[in-house]
Amino acid sequence: MTTLNSSNTLSSTFYLSGIPGYEEFHHWISIPFCLLYLVGIMALVGNAVLLILVRAEKNLHEPQFCFLAMLALTDLGLSLSTMPSVLAIFWFDVRDIGLNACLTQMFFIHTLSSVESGVLVAMAFDRLVAICAPLNYTKILTHYTVACLSGAALIRGATLLAPLPFFLRTFPFCGANILSHSYCYYPDMLNLACGDITFSSAYGLVFVLCTFAVDVVFILASYMKILDTIMKLETQDRNWRSLHTCACHLCTVLVFYLPLISLAVLHHYTQDTSPILYTTMSNAYLLMTPLLNPLIYSLKSRQIQAALRKRFWVQRVIAGE
């Protein structure tokens, strides 16, 4: 019986429905979604440019820009993990995906999301030290500390999410194997498994609450402390500039975390949510944040702007010669 189940599981093919219940309208729905995914291509370009700049400019080899580079690399991974299957659905109506490919995509999406969450925590800590303890910044955020924070984010994501594909492989998949997303999502796949999924489902929910929820609390606490420090500054212009930067950062954090945590909770507790809401939320944090991060965190940085101007000026001079 175990051999049969294993064989059935390994030969399973899944069907990515995109927006379940609205398949006949996909031709029209694809227009705004395709625009969103074209924006995702812009996100790929923006993050690639950021990585090149941080690597090329020595004055950008500072903790905050190291975290920015890691964030850009994570965003690149998220975009490349999701965009192919999403574009295949809406542009070419290709919906079938094998179990191995589905498990691989699911692992990378969830792992990279966890890594990005850890990087956002590290970036919040970086800003906390820079604004609240500027004189001790270089003492606290040494190269060793930056390496430890980056490594912890990567190891946490890979280690805690490694069991998910193995959980799914222990179950046979009997039925139509229709996934209600445009990519492979753990709770979605788990709902198609035959057997007792109580532990596997609880593990997924506890992971989300104990990582992403804890990260959100730390980030919000950090920015509250930052705002408290900023409000005590005397220079009104500095107040406005710092407040504006913090507000932009918080908006990006909310765009990433709210859909992610809401999706996990809704999948666990209800099956009656509108499929359009599911699809919109699932694509918001996977496609919008890779676009917003270079704009919010990078282009607002004077050092990044200076590096961009320098690079373009050099290219123009070379072209002129």
Q: What do the predicted segments below correspond to?
A:
Residues M1-E321:
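Transmembrane helical core of 7TM receptor-like proteins
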